[in-house]
Regions:
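Terminal leader/tail segments of proteins
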Residues: 1-127
């Protein structure tokens, strides 16, 4: 059985963690902002941030992005982008492939197609 579990990040309205078999997504309002995944069996973590993030607005989004990433502030996040620790991709294009080779849309479709699946939604809006 494959599960997708959705919860509010630290109980915050409009800030969501989406747990999937492929990894963990952070969604703010209606946009995917970040993804953390693991490379196969060696558990090497990789992180993608959406390349359309507006760094100058939505202070709540930036606050919860830092919490999701474990960064102290946005300056630290920007430094990790600069040094290659985080990669920028278009997470909100449903066909964008993540490192594991699947898009967010494909992950959800695959789970829905399986004979037994369970999704728990707490206010999540899929595009």
């Amino acid at each position: 059985m494959k599960y997708v579990y959705v919860e509010n990040l630290e109980g915050a309205k409009n800030q969501f963690l989406i747990h999937t078999p492929e990894g963990l997504y952070f969604q703010s309002y209606d946009s995917l902002i970040a993804f953390k995944g693991f490379e196969n069996m060696n558990a090497e973590e990789y992180t993608y941030l959406d390349n359309w993030i507006n760094w100058n607005s939505h202070s709540a989004t930036m606050k919860y992005l830092c919490i999701f990433l474990g960064d102290k502030n946005i300056a630290e996040t920007r430094e990790k982008i600069k040094n290659g620790e985080y990669s920028l991709i278009n997470l909100n294009n449903p066909t964008t492939k993540i490192k594991g080779g699947k898009s967010f849309e494909e992950v959800i479709k695959e789970i829905k197609k399986s004979n037994s699946w369970k999704m728990k939604f707490l206010g999540l809006k899929f595009k």
